[in-house]
Amino acid sequence: MILPDVQATKSEVAINLSRVGVTNVKKLVKVARPDKRPIILISTFNMYVDLPSERRGANLSRNFEVIDEVLEDMVKSPVYEIEDLCGEVARRLLNRHEYATRSEVHMDSELIVKRKTPQTEMQSQKVVKVFAKAIAERGEAIKVRRVIGSEVIGITACPCAQEIMRVSAENELQNLGVPQEKIDAFLNKIPMATHNQRGRGIVSIETAGEYEVPLNTLINIIEQSMSTMSFELLKRGDEYEVVRNAHANPKFVEDCVRDMARRVVTEFKDLPDDAVVKIKQINEESIHQHNAFAELSTTMGKLRTEIGQ
């Protein structure tokens, strides 16, 4: 018995659809590492194709077939970059959906990284978000653009409130008759109080070729661009160091984005000028109900020109 392909029938409203697919697909992904055990990620996938006006629906079961095939093939030919995994899924989606001209794959995961606390040097686990995306387009050949990115939580300290506290402390010490030389020495040694934020830094890089963008490098760039890192486990000595380090390195939300941009240019010298760089910082304020936000969307070429490298 031949079963009907209802999806291939004509729609009553003949218009093209930009994206049709499946979302929130959970899969176990094994990412290979040279000379190390693979990283195991529990990942969420969203997979789409465009749909021409002459079709009523897309054959969505093909999306599941493709992702399972690619994950199975990874056992034989290990994948080292999650954006390459998304790129292969996007390419096969176009091959499987012969009526589509464009496919899109999103992957979101959580990665555990280990960090040593600043004084006791205890190992502490930290959760960071990692994500990848691929867009495949049909032409004379299938062209694929890949995106790799990460979101990391850290700490920022407000420079504005800190300078207000510094001026106030200087005036109080002057009123107490403390010599200016000692006041200056004290203020240069002890960071003044200010309010803090839990910052979320996000960096993504999009390329059209086989360019390597190591996740660990992205994560380090984000961590180093805030006032200091956050830790899940802190003893008293560690807590002192974290608070002191944050207040010794105060940053606005804008400073974080610019620092991330500078580090991206320094770290990724081999990326082409047409690589797309997106950087975002969201700081959850402690003394306000709102969040502070800054964003940059540019290309590596423009970024190199602005920074002068």
Curated annotation (Swiss-Prot):
Q: Which pathway is recorded for this entry?
A: Cofactor biosynthesis; 5,6,7,8-tetrahydromethanopterin biosynthesis
> Positions of the site: May be catalytically important?
158
Family annotation (InterPro entries):
GTP_cyclohydrolase_FolE2/MptA, GTP_cyclohydrolase_MptA
Can you supply a Gene Ontology BP term from the record?
tetrahydromethanopterin biosynthetic process
- One Pfam family linked to the record: GCHY-1
Which molecular function GO terms apply here?
A: GTP cyclohydrolase I activity; GTP cyclohydrolase IV activity; iron ion binding
Q: Which domain of life is it from?
A: Archaea
Keywords carried by this UniProt record = Hydrolase, Iron, Metal-binding
**Enzyme nomenclature, EC number:** 3.5.4.39
Q: How is the cofactor bound?
A: Binds 1 Fe(2+) ion per subunit.
Which cofactors are reported in the record for this sequence? Fe(2+)
Reactions catalysed according to its record:
GTP + H2O = 7,8-dihydroneopterin 2',3'-cyclic phosphate + formate + diphosphate + H(+)
Q: How does it assemble?
A: Homodimer.
Q: What does this protein do?
A: Converts GTP to 7,8-dihydro-D-neopterin 2',3'-cyclic phosphate, the first intermediate in the biosynthesis of coenzyme methanopterin.
Q: Name the protein family.
A: Belongs to the GTP cyclohydrolase IV family.
Name of the protein: GTP cyclohydrolase MptA 2
Native organism is: Methanocella arvoryzae (strain DSM 22066 / NBRC 105507 / MRE50)
Gene, per the UniProt record? mptA2
